[in-house]
Amino acid sequence: MRGARGAWDFLFVLLLLLLVQTGSSQPSVSPGELSLPSIHPAKSELIVSVGDEIRLLCTDPGFVKWTFEILGQLSEKTNPEWITEKAEATNTGNYTCTNKGGLSSSIYVFVRDPEKLFLIDLPLYGKEENDTLVRCPLTDPEVTNYSLTGCEGKPLPKDLTFVADPKAGITIRNVKREYHRLCLHCSANQRGKSMLSKKFTLKVRAAIKAVPVVSVSKTSYLLREGEEFAVTCLIKDVSSSVDSMWIKENSQQTKAQTKKNSWHQGDFSYLRQERLTISSARVNDSGVFMCYANNTFGSANVTTTLEVVDKGFINIFPMMNTTVFVNDGENVDLVVEYEAYPKPVHRQWIYMNRTSTDKWDDYPKSENESNIRYVNELHLTRLKGTEGGTYTFHVSNSDVNSSVTFNVYVNTKPEILTHDRLVNGMLQCVAAGFPEPTIDWYFCPGTEQRCSVPVGPVDVQIQNSSVSPFGKLVVYSTIDDSTFKHNGTVECRAYNDVGKSSASFNFAFKGNSKEQIHAHTLFTPLLIGFVIAAGLMCIFVMILTYKYLQKPMYEVQWKVVEEINGNNYVYIDPTQLPYDHKWEFPRNRLSFGKTLGAGAFGKVVEATAYGLIKSDAAMTVAVKMLKPSAHLTEREALMSELKVLSYLGNHMNIVNLLGACTIGGPTLVITEYCCYGDLLNFLRRKRDSFICSKQEDHAEVALYKNLLHSKESSCNDSTNEYMDMKPGVSYVVPTKADKRRSARIGSYIERDVTPAIMEDDELALDLEDLLSFSYQVAKGMAFLASKNCIHRDLAARNILLTHGRITKICDFGLARDIKNDSNYVVKGNARLPVKWMAPESIFNCVYTFESDVWSYGIFLWELFSLGSSPYPGMPVDSKFYKMIKEGFRMLSPEHAPAEMYDIMKTCWDADPLKRPTFKQIVQLIEKQISESTNHIYSNLANCSPHRENPAVDHSVRINSVGSSASSTQPLLVHEDV
């Protein structure tokens, strides 16, 4: 091998010498006669095998340079000869020899490698509507079917076309946006074997067909000197090949700083933020700032205006004449608009510079963030004549204050003050009204009700002073009795623009003098008829009022009490509880869905709240609102519910308040949404799938037991342990048909349970679940007790269930149709859940923490009977009340462990002070639930964003004495039993 190479070198040297001699014997070539350099071997293509030698010789009279190019990469040599001793696949490419005149010759070399048919250049990019080259040149030109193939056998798009070149690769024609992220291989058949290249993923750069979309965070800013100015420009385009900048109007100098932040949002959406800031704005920074962006298609811009003032301001604009005339008994609204920066912190209306009124609304002129204009409306209703005067609106912020005054005059019908006296031969009529009344006199012979003959000019005096500067004007008019020569009636008539009134005076001649006979106007037949009609009308109104008051009125169930002298208590008026406006949530961020429950005056609607927890997050919530038919009482009740919920705070086992809308529209209360509805119907749905190890059959056992008499029998050896009640329908363990029977009409969420929710809770119900529900409700009630809150309507229908089988105590209030709910019995002026109420609540109208404990015992009976109604088959009548009073209680439900029935019996103790507290109940149930359930609940409580508030120990009992503050009437007096 070495000898062969030496011979080759010798021949190469001889060839060079011959060329030199030939060149020296020929005339030199002029620069204009330069020829192409010649390459040996004289071929356009050369095929070698991997490991072979590549030897290329370039001859030219002058200097030559070799250039090797493959996949866009270049390498150079200045020797006339290019030698590669052991060729590799990567030596495949175009070899070019260039002389000093710039003329060149090329040869393409294929290095055949069975292991490497394709040379690969990644990544693969393509521009929309242009051609793109898939760089996969071949190392062996003698293959067949050189083309593109989809990954994993997937077909290529039907409209994709390409052109194959073994030396360059495969060119895809007219790239489309739909090809983005297309996976493909270069493929070929080499000696009957199908070969694939490495995987290419085509990334398409979208063609720019429109100008960028430009927007700013706010279109105008108003600042005080020294405040920070910060505005963000958002540029949207299909790719990052967009330029952007902030420009100040008139190129004024400013100390503004800019910061850029960009990201891709999807495949063909590019976003860039240009944030402009001035840390301490000055008056001369005021002006117009333009955000400018451009791409290859064109440019776009948007502006924002900055106004910097040296200090804050308030400008008031009355929206009506400041002098207002209104008739007696009518309404008027005093409306002002005002501009204020910074935001106003104090607004007030003052009457006659001494008393304030709160019958006003204040709201922004628009929802725009840049809004500085506000509207304030004072509502004056059914104005009386004495309520005229000055009404001054005061508004202030941290810098200035301002005010505007309205002069309100109340137009009143004239009132005759004096008309039936003769003084020194003069008859006087005194009238008061506004505007100033006019008085006319009329005379008619005899005793008449009205006169038609006017009396000539009379002496009329106007009293300059009035009751108040804005009160009635008093007018005096006198007439000489010598004007009248005969017996008769004199009528005084006073009138103004509002109305008129009159009074008459009767006199008769007696000798040479006149004397008054009587002032007959009060007892005329017309007046008598009017008085009778008015009396009948009053009686009718009183009857209607009585009937209205006898109707069951809505009352907030949850009551907050305050302790006095340690034991006795009174209810706190919920309207006096504070409301923190931090709960306010914008109405326009609520999207309402289906109605979850409805009552006579209110309803609960499923809604989506945007930005309630996070600025860009959507959350499903429940919104309680009033129907248009609601009265003032119901509106106040809903506001009271809101105040009670905000006062209580958050706990995992109550339906927590999330927000509210009280400004600019009807009141909306936003609470947590519980997807599984109320616990009562959940239990009834799960009857068929309930798993319980306790299989005792209670179908043949009496339902009621006289607990009081049973205690006495243990002492007195009495054999009268049970009472033969024989209810109309005996208790039978529910059959499958019974279990499928619809529960209660109007139940919250039951009729709207979606398949998605049902699929999400396919697990069966077991005894551990019932114990967990008992435990959670006791925890929630312990929390309410720690807040001095009495529920008054604790039942399974008022317990909601959400994900993780977490129970939450609620009060449906206005949203429950208690009128059509048989669980609520009409007593007095309320509908009450009698079967869940403690004896002291039924007979003495006493509601305490202990009465809630009784209701909790009834709830446990519902729970462990899987949603059966308490006291089944028994109507609420005098017999029912008598049994409760005599100590009869329900026996253990079908699925209740003995320990849970013991808790029920202690909850139903006739002596309220012997019943356990909710804190003690929690401790009792805690011993029965499994460690895993307790552990899961503890973890949920710790991970919950609403942590439990520390409980207050109610071991010191509040005395079970009814508060005089309670408006609820006793259900049944002792004599009715």
From Swiss-Prot:
Enzyme active site: 793
Topological domain spans for side Cytoplasmic: 547-977
The enzyme's E.C. designation: 2.7.10.1
Cellular component GO terms held in the UniProt record: plasma membrane; receptor complex
Record-listed Phosphoserine modification sites: 742, 747, 822, 892, 960
PROSITE patterns, per the entry: IG_LIKE (PS50835), PROTEIN_KINASE_ATP (PS00107), PROTEIN_KINASE_DOM (PS50011), PROTEIN_KINASE_TYR (PS00109), RECEPTOR_TYR_KIN_III (PS00240)
Residues flagged as site, Interaction with SH2B2/APS: 569, 937
Activity regulation details: Present in an inactive conformation in the absence of bound ligand. KITLG/SCF binding leads to dimerization and activation by autophosphorylation on tyrosine residues. Activity is down-regulated by PRKCA-mediated phosphorylation on serine residues.
Positions in the Extracellular compartment: 26-525
Region (Important for interaction with phosphotyrosine-binding proteins): 569-571
Record's keyword terms, sorted: ATP-binding, Cell membrane, Disulfide bond, Glycoprotein, Immunoglobulin domain, Kinase, Magnesium, Membrane, Metal-binding, Nucleotide-binding, Phosphoprotein, Proto-oncogene, Receptor, Repeat, Signal, Transferase, Transmembrane, Transmembrane helix, Tyrosine-protein kinase, Ubl conjugation
Domain of life: Eukaryota
List of residues binding Mg(2+): 569, 798, 811
Role: Tyrosine-protein kinase that acts as a cell-surface receptor for the cytokine KITLG/SCF and plays an essential role in the regulation of cell survival and proliferation, hematopoiesis, stem cell maintenance, gametogenesis, mast cell development, migration and function, and in melanogenesis. In response to KITLG/SCF binding, KIT can activate several signaling pathways. Phosphorylates PIK3R1, PLCG1, SH2B2/APS and CBL. Activates the AKT1 signaling pathway by phosphorylation of PIK3R1, the regulatory subunit of phosphatidylinositol 3-kinase.
Protein name per UniProt: Mast/stem cell growth factor receptor Kit
Lineage: Eukaryota, Metazoa, Chordata, Craniata, Vertebrata
Gene: KIT
